[in-house]
Amino acid sequence: TWFGKKEVFEQLEGYRQMPLCEDYDFTLRAILKGYKISNLNEVVLKYRMTSDSISRSNLFEQYLYGCYITKQYSKKQIASIEDAHNYVKEHNNSKNAKKYLKANKYFNDALNDIENKSFISFIKNGLLLLFASKYYLNKIYRFVMVTLYS
């Protein structure tokens, strides 16, 4: 859910058809245009994930699109939709997608273990996560870096 000035949406010409990453693409384009983006420190929307959710069924593909968009952003460039599609097509395969999805399960299980104070299970899921997918570890690393430097 977004709150923003109409002029921001107009100048950016709204959302683009960037598969699986429309919000992320919009946010980085806004930053490149000099707008400030921020999060509220309170929950205003609860989102329920289901196994059929597009965010889950295409999780690795979404990660790849995000990587490409970020790579272009780090060069202070707006990602081309066509180039992003070609990048994903080149790097996506079912073996890595399955590993990534499995790593996501271990990660979420580990988070639940912390919440439930199941520390032995947390260690087990954490260790399994370490060896499940190098791409998922990269996602965690990127998240930590953004959190530290934001």
Predicted feature locations:
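C-terminal subregions of glycosyltransferases and related glycan-biosynthesis enzymes
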Residues: 49-150
